[in-house]
Amino acid sequence: MAIHLYKTSTPSTRNGAVDSKVKSNPRNNLIYGQHHCGKGRNARGIITAGHRGGGHKRLYRKIDFRRNEKDIYGRIVTIEYDPNRNAYICLIHYRDGEKRYILHPRGAIIGDTIVSGTEVPIKMGNALPLTDMPLGTAIHNIEITLGKGGQLARAAGAVAKLIAKEGKSATLKLPSGEVRLISKNCSATVGQVGNVGVNQKSLGRAGSKRWLGKRPVVRGVVMNPVDHPHGGGEGRAPIGRKQPTTPWGYPALGKRSRKRNKYSDNLILRRRSK
Protein backbone atom coordinates (compact mmCIF):
# COMPACT_ATOMS: atom_id res chain seq x y z
CA MET A 1 0.00 0.00 0.00
CA ALA A 2 1.07 3.60 -0.54
CA ILE A 3 2.63 5.75 2.17
CA HIS A 4 0.52 8.76 3.14
CA LEU A 5 2.08 12.06 4.24
CA TYR A 6 0.07 14.61 6.21
CA LYS A 7 0.12 18.39 5.82
CA THR A 8 2.75 19.81 8.18
CA SER A 9 0.43 21.53 10.64
CA THR A 10 1.99 20.07 13.82
CA PRO A 11 5.34 18.42 14.65
CA SER A 12 3.68 15.00 14.77
CA THR A 13 2.16 15.32 11.31
CA ARG A 14 5.34 16.90 9.95
CA ASN A 15 7.42 13.85 10.88
CA GLY A 16 4.82 11.14 10.41
CA ALA A 17 4.41 8.84 7.42
CA VAL A 18 1.69 6.19 7.64
CA ASP A 19 -0.01 3.63 5.40
CA SER A 20 -2.88 4.77 3.25
CA LYS A 21 -6.06 3.93 5.09
CA VAL A 22 -7.05 0.25 5.04
CA LYS A 23 -10.35 -0.45 6.75
CA SER A 24 -10.79 -3.15 9.35
CA ASN A 25 -14.25 -4.67 9.75
CA PRO A 26 -13.57 -8.26 10.88
CA ARG A 27 -16.14 -11.04 10.87
CA ASN A 28 -17.41 -11.93 14.34
CA ASN A 29 -16.84 -15.67 13.90
CA LEU A 30 -13.18 -15.12 12.94
CA ILE A 31 -12.12 -13.00 15.93
CA TYR A 32 -11.74 -13.45 19.68
CA GLY A 33 -10.51 -11.33 22.55
CA GLN A 34 -7.07 -11.42 24.11
CA HIS A 35 -6.22 -11.12 27.79
CA HIS A 36 -2.87 -9.37 28.20
CA CYS A 37 -2.16 -9.26 31.91
CA GLY A 38 1.62 -9.73 32.03
CA LYS A 39 2.93 -6.69 30.14
CA GLY A 40 6.30 -8.38 29.78
CA ARG A 41 6.25 -10.02 33.24
CA ASN A 42 6.54 -13.68 34.15
CA ALA A 43 4.40 -15.58 36.66
CA ARG A 44 6.36 -14.00 39.54
CA GLY A 45 5.72 -10.48 38.26
CA ILE A 46 9.36 -9.92 37.24
CA ILE A 47 10.09 -8.12 33.96
CA THR A 48 11.46 -10.64 31.46
CA ALA A 49 10.66 -8.74 28.24
CA GLY A 50 11.33 -5.04 28.60
CA HIS A 51 9.67 -2.01 27.08
CA ARG A 52 6.18 -3.50 26.96
CA GLY A 53 2.94 -2.26 28.45
CA GLY A 54 -0.18 -0.27 27.71
CA GLY A 55 -1.33 -0.15 24.13
CA HIS A 56 -4.73 -0.23 22.52
CA LYS A 57 -7.05 -3.17 23.10
CA ARG A 58 -6.95 -5.65 20.21
CA LEU A 59 -9.10 -8.42 18.82
CA TYR A 60 -7.21 -11.41 17.46
CA ARG A 61 -8.01 -12.46 13.89
CA LYS A 62 -7.91 -16.21 13.23
CA ILE A 63 -5.48 -16.62 10.33
CA ASP A 64 -5.47 -19.78 8.22
CA PHE A 65 -1.78 -20.68 8.14
CA ARG A 66 -2.49 -24.34 7.29
CA ARG A 67 -4.40 -23.66 4.05
CA ASN A 68 -6.12 -27.04 4.33
CA GLU A 69 -9.11 -26.23 2.11
CA LYS A 70 -7.75 -28.51 -0.61
CA ASP A 71 -8.74 -28.11 -4.27
CA ILE A 72 -11.53 -25.64 -3.45
CA TYR A 73 -11.30 -22.26 -5.12
CA GLY A 74 -11.75 -19.14 -3.04
CA ARG A 75 -12.21 -15.47 -3.88
CA ILE A 76 -10.59 -12.48 -2.15
CA VAL A 77 -13.44 -10.39 -0.77
CA THR A 78 -11.65 -7.82 1.42
CA ILE A 79 -8.14 -6.62 2.26
CA GLU A 80 -8.04 -5.58 5.92
CA TYR A 81 -5.72 -4.12 8.54
CA ASP A 82 -4.64 -6.47 11.33
CA PRO A 83 -3.40 -4.85 14.57
CA ASN A 84 -1.57 -8.03 15.58
CA ARG A 85 0.93 -8.04 12.68
CA ASN A 86 2.49 -5.64 10.20
CA ALA A 87 1.13 -7.55 7.17
CA TYR A 88 -2.39 -7.08 5.87
CA ILE A 89 -4.88 -9.94 5.74
CA CYS A 90 -7.45 -11.08 3.15
CA LEU A 91 -10.90 -12.48 3.75
CA ILE A 92 -11.46 -15.49 1.47
CA HIS A 93 -14.88 -16.84 0.50
CA TYR A 94 -14.58 -20.46 -0.65
CA ARG A 95 -17.07 -22.12 -2.97
CA ASP A 96 -18.16 -24.56 -0.26
CA GLY A 97 -19.24 -21.64 1.96
CA GLU A 98 -16.15 -21.58 4.20
CA LYS A 99 -14.75 -18.15 5.10
CA ARG A 100 -11.17 -17.67 6.30
CA TYR A 101 -8.45 -15.07 6.68
CA ILE A 102 -5.03 -15.50 5.04
CA LEU A 103 -1.97 -13.28 4.77
CA HIS A 104 -2.27 -10.77 1.95
CA PRO A 105 0.09 -11.70 -0.93
CA ARG A 106 1.80 -8.78 -2.63
CA GLY A 107 -0.13 -7.68 -5.71
CA ALA A 108 -3.35 -9.53 -4.85
CA ILE A 109 -6.52 -7.49 -5.34
CA ILE A 110 -10.17 -7.96 -4.47
CA GLY A 111 -11.78 -10.46 -6.83
CA ASP A 112 -8.71 -12.64 -7.38
CA THR A 113 -9.12 -16.39 -6.92
CA ILE A 114 -6.79 -18.68 -4.98
CA VAL A 115 -6.60 -22.40 -4.31
CA SER A 116 -4.48 -24.84 -2.35
CA GLY A 117 -3.65 -28.45 -3.17
CA THR A 118 -1.08 -30.72 -4.80
CA GLU A 119 -1.58 -30.00 -8.49
CA VAL A 120 -2.52 -26.34 -8.63
CA PRO A 121 -1.10 -23.55 -10.83
CA ILE A 122 2.06 -21.75 -9.72
CA LYS A 123 0.19 -18.52 -9.13
CA MET A 124 0.46 -15.81 -6.50
CA GLY A 125 -1.54 -16.76 -3.40
CA ASN A 126 -1.84 -20.47 -4.21
CA ALA A 127 -0.54 -22.94 -1.62
CA LEU A 128 1.06 -26.26 -2.55
CA PRO A 129 3.85 -28.61 -1.41
CA LEU A 130 7.46 -27.67 -2.14
CA THR A 131 7.88 -30.83 -4.22
CA ASP A 132 5.42 -29.46 -6.81
CA MET A 133 7.14 -26.07 -7.16
CA PRO A 134 9.84 -25.26 -9.74
CA LEU A 135 13.24 -24.05 -8.59
CA GLY A 136 13.51 -20.30 -8.08
CA THR A 137 9.91 -19.87 -6.90
CA ALA A 138 9.35 -16.99 -4.47
CA ILE A 139 7.33 -18.24 -1.49
CA HIS A 140 6.10 -17.27 1.98
CA ASN A 141 4.15 -18.83 4.88
CA ILE A 142 6.37 -21.92 4.86
CA GLU A 143 5.76 -24.99 7.01
CA ILE A 144 8.59 -26.45 9.09
CA THR A 145 6.59 -29.43 10.36
CA LEU A 146 4.18 -31.13 7.96
CA GLY A 147 0.57 -30.21 8.75
CA LYS A 148 1.42 -27.69 11.48
CA GLY A 149 0.90 -24.63 9.29
CA GLY A 150 3.20 -21.94 7.99
CA GLN A 151 5.82 -20.64 10.44
CA LEU A 152 8.48 -19.00 8.26
CA ALA A 153 8.39 -15.80 6.14
CA ARG A 154 5.13 -14.38 7.47
CA ALA A 155 6.07 -10.74 8.19
CA ALA A 156 5.22 -7.85 5.86
CA GLY A 157 7.41 -7.95 2.74
CA ALA A 158 8.94 -11.33 3.65
CA VAL A 159 9.85 -13.70 0.84
CA ALA A 160 11.93 -16.89 0.64
CA LYS A 161 13.32 -18.67 -2.40
CA LEU A 162 13.34 -22.35 -3.34
CA ILE A 163 16.89 -22.99 -4.58
CA ALA A 164 17.27 -26.81 -4.65
CA LYS A 165 15.49 -30.14 -4.21
CA GLU A 166 17.33 -33.35 -3.41
CA GLY A 167 16.09 -36.56 -1.86
CA LYS A 168 13.41 -35.91 0.73
CA SER A 169 14.47 -32.31 1.39
CA ALA A 170 14.22 -28.92 -0.26
CA THR A 171 16.75 -26.13 0.21
CA LEU A 172 15.38 -22.67 0.95
CA LYS A 173 16.98 -19.27 1.28
CA LEU A 174 15.07 -17.44 4.00
CA PRO A 175 14.58 -13.67 4.37
CA SER A 176 17.29 -13.56 7.07
CA GLY A 177 19.85 -14.96 4.61
CA GLU A 178 19.86 -18.37 6.28
CA VAL A 179 19.95 -21.39 3.97
CA ARG A 180 18.31 -24.46 5.44
CA LEU A 181 16.69 -27.79 4.58
CA ILE A 182 12.96 -28.47 4.89
CA SER A 183 10.93 -31.53 3.97
CA LYS A 184 9.69 -31.44 0.37
CA ASN A 185 6.22 -32.44 1.56
CA CYS A 186 5.79 -29.22 3.56
CA SER A 187 3.55 -26.59 2.01
CA ALA A 188 4.16 -22.93 1.22
CA THR A 189 2.31 -20.09 -0.46
CA VAL A 190 3.51 -18.66 -3.77
CA GLY A 191 4.54 -15.01 -3.80
CA GLN A 192 5.66 -12.36 -1.35
CA VAL A 193 3.82 -11.05 1.69
CA GLY A 194 2.21 -7.69 1.01
CA ASN A 195 2.70 -4.27 2.65
CA VAL A 196 6.31 -4.12 1.46
CA GLY A 197 6.67 -0.45 2.38
CA VAL A 198 6.11 -0.99 6.09
CA ASN A 199 9.73 -0.04 6.84
CA GLN A 200 9.09 3.40 5.32
CA LYS A 201 6.53 4.27 7.98
CA SER A 202 7.36 6.92 10.56
CA LEU A 203 5.12 7.15 13.60
CA GLY A 204 5.96 10.82 14.06
CA ARG A 205 5.40 11.03 17.81
CA ALA A 206 5.83 9.07 21.01
CA GLY A 207 2.11 8.60 21.57
CA SER A 208 1.76 6.49 18.43
CA LYS A 209 4.43 4.16 19.80
CA ARG A 210 2.55 3.83 23.08
CA TRP A 211 -0.61 2.84 21.20
CA LEU A 212 1.36 -0.17 19.92
CA GLY A 213 2.10 -1.28 23.49
CA LYS A 214 5.77 -0.25 23.42
CA ARG A 215 7.30 1.72 26.30
CA PRO A 216 10.44 3.91 26.24
CA VAL A 217 13.89 2.31 26.01
CA VAL A 218 16.40 3.57 28.60
CA ARG A 219 20.13 2.97 28.18
CA GLY A 220 21.87 1.10 30.96
CA VAL A 221 24.73 3.61 31.10
CA VAL A 222 22.39 6.33 32.41
CA MET A 223 20.95 4.13 35.18
CA ASN A 224 22.13 3.68 38.73
CA PRO A 225 24.48 0.79 39.57
CA VAL A 226 21.67 -0.98 41.41
CA ASP A 227 19.61 -1.12 38.21
CA HIS A 228 22.17 -2.06 35.55
CA PRO A 229 25.83 -3.22 35.36
CA HIS A 230 26.59 -0.26 33.06
CA GLY A 231 25.19 2.28 35.52
CA GLY A 232 26.91 4.65 37.92
CA GLY A 233 29.95 6.85 37.69
CA GLU A 234 30.45 10.60 37.79
CA GLY A 235 28.95 12.35 34.80
CA ARG A 236 29.16 10.58 31.46
CA ALA A 237 31.21 7.49 32.30
CA PRO A 238 32.13 4.35 30.32
CA ILE A 239 30.56 1.03 31.23
CA GLY A 240 33.66 -0.07 33.15
CA ARG A 241 33.68 -3.62 31.80
CA LYS A 242 35.50 -5.57 29.12
CA GLN A 243 32.30 -6.16 27.18
CA PRO A 244 28.68 -4.96 27.33
CA THR A 245 26.28 -6.99 29.43
CA THR A 246 22.55 -7.39 29.93
CA PRO A 247 20.87 -6.13 33.12
CA TRP A 248 21.42 -9.64 34.52
CA GLY A 249 25.13 -9.75 33.72
CA TYR A 250 25.09 -11.93 30.60
CA PRO A 251 27.18 -10.91 27.54
CA ALA A 252 25.33 -8.67 25.08
CA LEU A 253 25.81 -6.93 21.71
CA GLY A 254 27.41 -9.54 19.49
CA LYS A 255 27.54 -12.63 21.70
CA ARG A 256 25.89 -15.61 20.01
CA SER A 257 22.91 -16.66 22.06
CA ARG A 258 21.75 -19.70 20.07
CA LYS A 259 21.60 -22.91 22.07
CA ARG A 260 24.48 -25.29 21.39
CA ASN A 261 23.78 -28.68 19.79
CA LYS A 262 20.25 -27.70 18.85
CA TYR A 263 18.28 -30.34 16.97
CA SER A 264 18.02 -28.19 13.83
CA ASP A 265 21.77 -27.48 13.52
CA ASN A 266 22.19 -30.23 10.93
CA LEU A 267 19.41 -28.67 8.81
CA ILE A 268 21.05 -25.23 8.57
CA LEU A 269 23.51 -25.11 5.68
CA ARG A 270 24.47 -21.45 6.08
CA ARG A 271 24.02 -19.26 9.12
CA ARG A 272 21.87 -16.17 8.80
CA SER A 273 23.62 -12.93 7.97
CA LYS A 274 23.85 -10.24 10.64
Swiss-Prot record:
Pfam families xrefs: Ribosomal_L2 (PF00181), Ribosomal_L2_C (PF03947)
Main localization, broad class: plastid
Chain residue ranges for the region called Disordered: 1-23, 224-274
Lipoprotein among keywords: no
Highest taxon of source: Eukaryota
Gene3D superfamilies: 2.30.30.30, Nucleic acid-binding proteins, Ribosomal protein L2, domain 3
Gene Ontology molecular function: rRNA binding; structural constituent of ribosome; transferase activity
Family in the record: Belongs to the universal ribosomal protein uL2 family.
Keywords: Chloroplast, Plastid, Ribonucleoprotein, Ribosomal protein
Cellular compartment(s): Plastid, Chloroplast
Name of the protein this chain belongs to: Large ribosomal subunit protein uL2cz/uL2cy
Record text on subunit structure and interactions: Part of the 50S ribosomal subunit.
Keyword DNA repair: no
InterPro entries associated with the record: NA-bd_OB-fold (IPR012340), Rib_uL2_dom2 (IPR014722), Ribosomal_uL2 (IPR002171), Ribosomal_uL2_bac/org-type (IPR005880), Ribosomal_uL2_C (IPR022669), Ribosomal_uL2_CS (IPR022671), Ribosomal_uL2_dom3 (IPR014726), Ribosomal_uL2_RNA-bd_dom (IPR022666)
GO CC aspect terms: chloroplast; large ribosomal subunit
SMART domains: Ribosomal_L2, Ribosomal_L2_C
Alphabetical GO biological process terms: translation
SUPFAM superfamilies: Nucleic acid-binding proteins, Translation proteins SH3-like domain
